[in-house]
Amino acid sequence: MRLLWVCVCWVPCLAAADWPQWRGPDRSNVSKETGLLQEWPADGPPVRWQASGLGLGISPVSVAAGRVYTVGNRDGAEYAFALDAATGAKVWATRLGATVAENSLMRWLTQRSPTVDGERVYTLTANGELFCLRAADGQKLWQKNYATDFPTRRPWGYCDYPMVDGDRLICTPFSINGMIVAFNKFNGEVVWTTLGEGEGPAGYGATVMSTAGGIPQYVFLFRNQLMGVAAEDGRVLWQHLRVDLRYGGTYTPLVQDLRIFSPNGYGGGMAMFKLTACGDEFVAEQEYHEPFNFDAFQDSTVLVGDHVYTFGPGGKPACIELGSGKVLWEKETAHGTKRAALTYAGDRLYLRHINGVVSLAEVSPAGYTEKGSFKIPLHEPSMGVTFPVVAAGRLWIRDNDRLFCYDIRAGGTGGGPVPPQDVLLTLTAEELAAEGSAAGPIRQGRDRAPDAIFIPTPDDVVERMLGMADVKPGELVYDLGSGDGRIVIAAAKKHGARAVGYEIDPRLVELSRKKVAEQQLDRLVTIEHEDVFTLDLSKADVITVFLYPALMERLKPQLQKLKPGTRIVSHQFEFPGVPAKQAVTVESKEDNESHRLFLWTAPLPARKPAPQEAPR
């Protein structure tokens, strides 16, 4: 059977190597790249560059016309970034608006990769603001607001994947005022709107284009309904109630001729529907429904021929026969527990596991054969997983604040090893102060949104950090971003130190204060509800920190004022451009992960020169 994913208006104007939107040019999550490595070296493919400073988030990259686009949360705001694909240097950064305070676990699981269409870039904030940016310099051309124009229940923030079709931008606010809306892509005017019905939270899946039955249409999940609407005017062509669709679908339907495969997480299983033409409309009949425990958050499916490759329970790769829904195999690997994401290119499956392992596999209905793996350097734990992207002979892997570019071409560079570049993305005063639609200049103070989610440091790593700092009785320890208070409690309880934890999240402040009181450490330990970037740190003897490189960079003015001899220990990340006095790797028995620790002593040594950024 022929795979029918139609992007007629896009394909002629795209370079073969581009990946300009969520799940690629045709939203199949299958790259058309050729000439790629079929097996990786023992330590993985070579890194061409890595860039840090994107901020918190797991949005995948979009690649088009020699640039890489993504979005992230840093300095109290959401930013859209454009980087030079060859070097990782920043081309521009545009502040979209203030970071919204949502559920601390869920807010970073939405993908929201930008959509690139020639001279324009379209992106959505978690607050529901849709922007059209100029690709050349990030200038805002127009914007809309889902929250005011198409309100709906969004318990975990907004997530949409704008799709360009000719001169229209197709968006899914998933509101009863507009479950799907066609905007004029040039000026943002509404062309048509399809009204929704029913109550309940909106979904988080993407829309795909199809020409099933010779009628151009958009296929998507709306609440508990799978449906198709006409591309011409948004009229509903068909719909089917999926009573097993739970918590809002996160998966993109897979379309093959007149058949539509609909997966869903939370135990919703998988269903196949067949469309039958009835005049200028269709009837959708369910052919089968089979149980399968797809990942609840990740849209990890690819359709290759007549088989679907995805992840099953525990992050195990799996193969499903499309025609019957039969699970042909599930593979137990050494890498995956919990969550994972995948893509397909050059007859290989690329898998990105939540523990930071990236692997390459040859897959077929007969089985799964691994062809190499590596672990992301200094992997940053996260509640979600960013999708790998294969484009322009490169594998793009985002790890929260950082983006890695790997060369996966079969021929390599042809000129021998190339030293990888390490780029720190800094923001200009203009970029920091630029007004977003939701707020003015960057906020400071304890009432703003956190810069990072709380990820507990294992207790055995905590003890190694304090030992590395040589904490002595009576010394003053500051923990910046103290979370549940475990570091300051350990410093007092095991080392006899006085300790202050600074935390911006009021819920964590309350939690850690209770823990301090329960252990009767009130005389030695204090928990302060503060913004660490506003503090005077000069009295500390020891400082512990677990922050992204861009946030470490913001601490620089405060750290330069430390008294001589103050020890600074960082978990996982180096202070950008400043060589550490000592660096160690700790193998934690608590989480079975490797953790990097770095030590500096004040005054800090001179910075290493940073790579130059591309001109704007």
Predicted regions and their residues:
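A short SAM/SAH-binding and catalytic strip from SAM-dependent methyltransferases
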Residues: 538-554
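Class I SAM-dependent transferase core
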Residues: 428-472
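Conserved SAM-binding motif I beta-strand of class I
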Residues: 498-503
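Conserved SAM-binding loop of SAM-dependent methyltransferases across substrates and taxa
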Residues: 486-496
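Conserved class I S-adenosyl-L-methionine
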Residues: 474-483
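S-adenosyl-L-methionine
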Residues: 505-539
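Noncatalytic, solvent-exposed loop/strand surfaces
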Residues: 16-433
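C-terminal substrate-binding/active-site "lid" region of AdoMet-derived donor-dependent transferases
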Residues: 550-609
